[in-house]
């Protein structure tokens, strides 16, 4: 039986890198999948989180390859400089397609699986010109430009929500198995130093007051510094409200300088970075989240039944549409950072929910995490999909 070579193109921030990592891990957990594959080639930018994560995966799986490429972005801002850059990049686009064609031939790619970011578009054109099969997954309520284009050439289109793209199949989000870690941390007294020292910082923090409402703050590293600063100011001015919470804040790399400011409050616990395994603890034990409105992160939080307060990135349509969907379907809360009363609205929300405790989820979390990946992988490996 001929084995296939798969190309994957995606974006490089955490909640886009981790799903493709999860998809690859899922393949290698199941012999019926990985026995049909000769290699998986990850197309992306080398100086990025995607490269770091992929290199970690490669240590365990020698059939993985990272292919660094130059990428393209269409800028929809109205600034003159953005228009000039778009014109310049359109001339460069031909070169980027040609480099992708070269790498497709080098790695003898049979099929492309892609997501929505600009790094994927030259790769999609290369796949089409070489008559390779294309599978697309769109995670948002409203499709981005790249996937609108890619879906026109795709042999199969999957979405996270209904009615997003024509002729698509709704499978939900691609989520990580690591967020269903079942390690118990109960009944480990601090006096038992050996076991206590084996706990991660996240595990130790859940010996905090269980009667309080647990709030998780999980904005991205990019474009979120002002949000963290606004939250800190709101806490400083309204601590009588926030003292009712145990607050867990993930700062990420670009906001670590705020750690000392948050840490002056005993009920606020900060993390520079959280693994997917520790994310399970945070999602399992927290009641409310304050977050952006990226669909992968929202889906993870809703699996564990959190009440979600969403602050969409103000200049992108997708996050507002995602947030509106969650408001309508789940009764979650949209907090607009462009509103002049943003900080007051935020403190009012947390005053209202200071005694809130979530109900335990009755969902089959394991099935929800596995099903989308199984459907997509079976489509990738189907001989009807890729075999000429």
Which stretches of residues belong to each language-model region?
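Acidic donor-binding loop of glycosyltransferase active sites
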Residues: 109, 284-297, 306
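An amphipathic, basic-hydrophobic alpha-helix
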Residues: 76-111, 129
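Donor-nucleotide binding loops and adjacent catalytic segments primarily
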Residues: 11, 78-79, 188-189, 193-288, ...
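Conserved nucleotide-sugar phosphate-binding/catalytic loop shared by glycosyltransferases and other
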Residues: 6-9, 13, 33-92, 269, ...
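C-terminal alpha-helical cap of glycosyltransferases
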Residues: 348-355, 367-388
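Active-site-proximal region of nucleotide-activated glycan assembly enzymes
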Residues: 129-206
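An aromatic- and histidine-rich active-site surface loop
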Residues: 48-51, 111-130
């Amino acid at each position: 039986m001929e084995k296939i070579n798969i190309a994957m193109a995606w974006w490089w921030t955490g909640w886009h890198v981790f799903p493709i990592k999860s998809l690859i891990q899922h393949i290698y957990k199941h012999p019926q999948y990985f026995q049909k594959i000769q290699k998986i080639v990850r197309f992306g930018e080398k100086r990025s989180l995607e490269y770091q994560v992929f290199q970690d995966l490669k240590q365990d799986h020698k059939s993985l390859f990272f292919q660094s490429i130059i990428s393209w972005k269409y800028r929809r801002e109205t600034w003159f400089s953005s228009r000039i850059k778009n014109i310049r990049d359109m001339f460069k686009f031909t070169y980027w397609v040609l480099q992708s064609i070269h790498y497709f031939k080098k790695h003898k790619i049979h099929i492309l699986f892609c997501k929505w970011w600009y790094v994927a578009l030259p790769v999609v054109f290369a796949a089409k010109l070489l008559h390779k099969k294309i599978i697309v997954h769109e995670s948002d309520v409203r499709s981005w430009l790249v996937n609108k284009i890619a879906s026109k050439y795709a042999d199969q289109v999957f979405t996270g929500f209904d009615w997003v793209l024509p002729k698509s199949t709704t499978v939900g989000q691609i989520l990580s198995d690591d967020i269903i870690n079942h390690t118990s941390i109960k009944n480990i007294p601090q006096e038992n130093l050996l076991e206590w020292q084996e706990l991660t910082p996240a595990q130790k923090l859940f010996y905090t007051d269980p009667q309080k409402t647990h709030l998780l703050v999980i904005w991205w590293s990019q474009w979120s510094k002002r949000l963290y600063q606004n939250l800190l100011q709101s806490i400083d001015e309204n601590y009588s409200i926030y003292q009712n919470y145990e607050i867990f804040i993930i700062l990420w790399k670009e906001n670590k300088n705020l750690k000392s400011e948050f840490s002056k409050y005993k009920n606020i616990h900060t993390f520079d970075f959280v693994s997917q395994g520790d994310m399970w603890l945070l999602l399992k034990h927290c009641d409310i989240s304050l977050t952006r409105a990226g669909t992968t992160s929202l889906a993870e939080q809703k699996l564990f039944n959190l009440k979600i307060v969403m602050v969409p990135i103000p200049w992108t349509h997708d996050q507002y549409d995602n947030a509106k969907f969650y408001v309508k379907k789940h009764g979650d809360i949209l907090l607009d950072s462009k509103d002049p009363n943003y900080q007051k609205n935020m403190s009012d929300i947390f005053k209202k929910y200071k005694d809130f405790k979530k109900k335990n989820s009755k969902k089959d979390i394991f099935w929800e995490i596995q099903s989308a990946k199984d459907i997509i992988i079976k489509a990738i490996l189907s001989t009807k999909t890729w075999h000429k």
